[in-house]
From Swiss-Prot:
Keywords: ATP-binding, Ligase, Nucleotide-binding. ATP-dependent carboxylate-amine ligase which exhibits weak glutamate--cysteine ligase activity. The lineage of its organism: Bacteria, Pseudomonadati, Acidobacteriota, Terriglobia, Bryobacterales. Belongs to the glutamate--cysteine ligase type 2 family. YbdK subfamily. This is Putative glutamate--cysteine ligase 2.
């Protein structure tokens, strides 16, 4: 019997993106502190701009958006304004899960008590966590419903990673992985695919145990690939690398929303979506990190390997009946473009293998981050220089 409430989730969308602040001459990461990007950004965008732990990371976030078109408009506006602001202060913004050659040892920590506490607790694990992600919040107001939907949605996390994989380089080396970001983050405690939870109370008991035994001081330090957000009434997808193009971010966010909408419909009809163990899903996560779209994943039901692109096509078919109601047909259709032209890692590697120059890869990342946001004269003239 389902424990879920009869209250339908709003399926609202919130998107958080993490950008790299780049020196336009060296193409290395550079602190945004002296340029006051965050402070100036807050004057333009209020709380939609935030610092992150490293001084070369800027985080932006939308408000609560009622549909994917609203989210797209807001992300476009934020990207345009923060890119202009960066250029006016002799910086560039690049989107990717890692920087191709930046050295984490050289990065300064943002002067904030929260980040100082994390570094003091996790030491080198925190200092080395020079990564950039995309987080997607989907509105699920009832907590019991959120836990049950999280249980089911875990299966789809590796497929989302394969689509978003955009971190093939680390400290100047070609890693052989499409997403090295997730391997860096794995060093943190309380990460990866969550276990199954039978109820919200079971999850609450877990959180309370960690707090009472001084493992954590709040539930935000549970950094799973998907989690019920401790302060917002949302399910938060956290597995994705930061994509380069706006259209990629929106396509992946739309797919996250459609997956939750479809899973809720299944439960609403008193049907069940089979739950798989964390250990099985972790096998697919490794394959997604290692091979991206070019590998095979396990179809657990058929107990066989299937090309990743084929399984993602099956997911698109799986959610197809909820897409018209969500109004996201055009946005989700972009998933097929990603599969045709490659994810961000594929395209970064293509540039590197053609040029042998990681600085050219950074140039490409900057171009793709700005793609479609401005008239051609903007990037050609280098507005704000």
């Amino acid at each position: 019997m389902s424990l879920m409430s009869s209250v339908r989730p709003s399926l609202s969308i919130g998107i958080e993106e993490e950008y790299q602040t780049v020196d336009p001459v060296t193409r290395d990461l550079r602190s945004h502190i002296h340029a006051e990007i965050v402070q100036k950004g807050k004057l333009l965008l209020a709380e939609r701009v935030k610092p992150e732990m490293h001084q070369s990371v800027v985080e932006i976030g939308t408000g609560v958006c009622q549909n994917i078109q609203e989210a797209k408009d807001e992300i476009r506006d934020i990207r345009q304004q923060i890119i202009r602001l960066a250029r006016q202060n002799d910086l560039r913004l690049a989107a990717g899960g890692t920087h191709p050659f930046a050295q984490w040892r050289e990065q300064e920590i943002y002067p904030d008590d929260r980040y100082r506490t994390i570094v003091e607790d996790l030491k080198m694990v925190a200092r080395a966590n020079l990564i950039f992600g995309l987080h997607v919040h989907i509105g699920v107001e009832d907590r019991e419903t959120a836990i049950q939907l999280m249980n089911s949605a875990r299966y789809f996390l590796p497929h989302l990673l394969a689509l978003s994989a955009n971190s093939p380089f680390w400290v100047g080396m070609e890693t052989g992985l499409r997403s090295y970001r997730c391997k860096v983050f794995d060093k943190f405690p309380r990460t990866n695919i969550p276990d199954l939870y039978q109820s919200w109370s079971e999850f609450e008991n877990y959180v309370n145990l960690l707090i009472h035994t001084n493992c954590i001081d709040n539930a935000k330090k549970i950094w799973w690939d998907i989690r019920p957000h401790p302060y917002f009434p949302t399910l938060e997808f956290r597995i994705c690398d930061m994509p380069m193009r706006l259209e990629e971010t929106i396509a992946i966010a739309a797919l996250c929303q459609a997956i939750i909408a479809k899973l809720y419909r299944i439960h609403e009809q008193n049907l069940t979506f089979r739950h798989y163990s964390r250990s099985l899903i972790m096998e697919n996560k490794w394959r997604a990190a290692r091979y991206g779209l070019d590998g095979k994943m396990i179809d657990f039901g058929k107990q066989t390997e299937v090309p990743a692109r084929q399984l993602i096509e099956e997911i698109l078919e799986f959610v197809s009946d909820v897409v018209p109601e969500l109004g996201s047909r055009e946005e989700i259709a972009y998933i097929r473009r990603i599969m045709e032209h490659g994810n961000g890692a594929d395209r970064q590697l293509r540039v590197f293998h053609e040029t042998g120059d990681l600085k050219k890869v950074v140039d490409y990342m900057i171009e793709e981050t700005e793609y479609g946001l401005f008239a051609p004269a903007f990037t050609a003239a280098g507005e704000g220089q």
